[in-house]
Regions:
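Conserved alpha-helical positions within TPR/SEL1-like repeat arrays
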Residues: 1-9, 20, 32-47, 72-87, ...
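Hydrophobic/aromatic packing residues within the alpha-helices of TPR/SEL1-like helical repeat arrays
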Residues: 20, 58, 62-65, 98, ...
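A detector of tandem-repeat and repeat-rich interaction/domain scaffolds
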Residues: 52-55, 59, 90-95, 102
Length: 241
């Protein structure tokens, strides 16, 4: 079942990649839709772990956005490059691109992008084991977050970072806050982390409950993705941030 599921997803990404490559051939080189096609194509490559084509495509998107003087296009491509390098554990390159993206977001005073990029930077520091610096960045993400967005992902990352800092009570507080409005994907990670915390604290009964809930979330995710059709996949990739 695991092999069939991943084979299905791989085929859908191949179809999406082919669709975006076809769209590039007919897209006008001086209009905004081409930037979205580039970025969605890069994301498809990234999702298939084709990192060199992803980087090449994001750079093409960046160059096109520069010619068009489209700051949001430049911002999206720059953050995309940071994401690809972060996935490959090339932290210094990732941080360099994230800092460039953050400067652009601050210049256009877009707090939604600022929140997202501060979270990106926090994750890199967290992966490096620099938990105090990660906490500073996630606090900035919360400070700059617009009042009308769902903060569940940010709360989750703050809880995870606090867990790594061994501030267990504070970690549980933020993870619990994250769970109230989280989507199924974030909930799976939240309950998995709460399971690990309770297991370490020898609260085995509570740990089992969290583990069962996490497994239920993972099962639901598998069913959702397994039944995803190509048009839904393309819609997912059309989200700009």
């Amino acid at each position: 079942m695991f092999h069939i599921y991943h084979s299905y997803v791989a085929k859908e990404y191949i179809k999406a990649t082919e669709a975006y490559l076809t769209a590039l051939k007919t897209a006008s080189p001086n209009q905004a839709p081409i930037l979205q096609i580039y970025n969605n194509l890069a994301l498809c490559y990234e999702s298939q772990e084709f990192y060199l084509p992803a980087i090449k495509t994001y750079k093409e998107s960046y160059a096109t956005a520069e010619k068009m003087q489209d700051k949001y296009g430049i911002l999206h491509a720059t953050r995309g490059l940071g994401n690809v390098y972060a996935i490959q554990d090339e932290e210094e390159k990732a941080l360099s691109y994230y800092q460039k993206a953050l400067s652009i977001a601050q210049s256009i005073k877009d707090s939604l992008w600022e929140n997202a990029i501060f979270c990106d930077i926090a994750k890199v520091y967290d992966d490096q084991g620099l938990y105090i610096e990660a906490k500073k960045q996630i606090d900035l993400a919360l400070r700059y977050a617009p009042s009308n967005i769902n903060l569940s992902p940010t709360y989750f990352w703050k809880g995870s970072i606090l867990y790594n800092l061994e501030e267990t009570d504070s970690a549980i507080h933020y993870l619990s806050r994250a769970s109230t409005k989280a989507n199924i994907y974030t909930k799976a990670s939240i309950y998995q982390t709460l399971y690990e915390i309770n297991k370490e604290n020898k609260n085995y009964e509570q740990a089992i409950l969290y583990n069962d809930t996490a497994l239920t979330c993972y099962d639901s995710i598998q069913k959702i993705i397994h039944h995803t059709e190509i048009n839904n996949l393309i819609k997912k990739h059309s989200i700009y941030i």
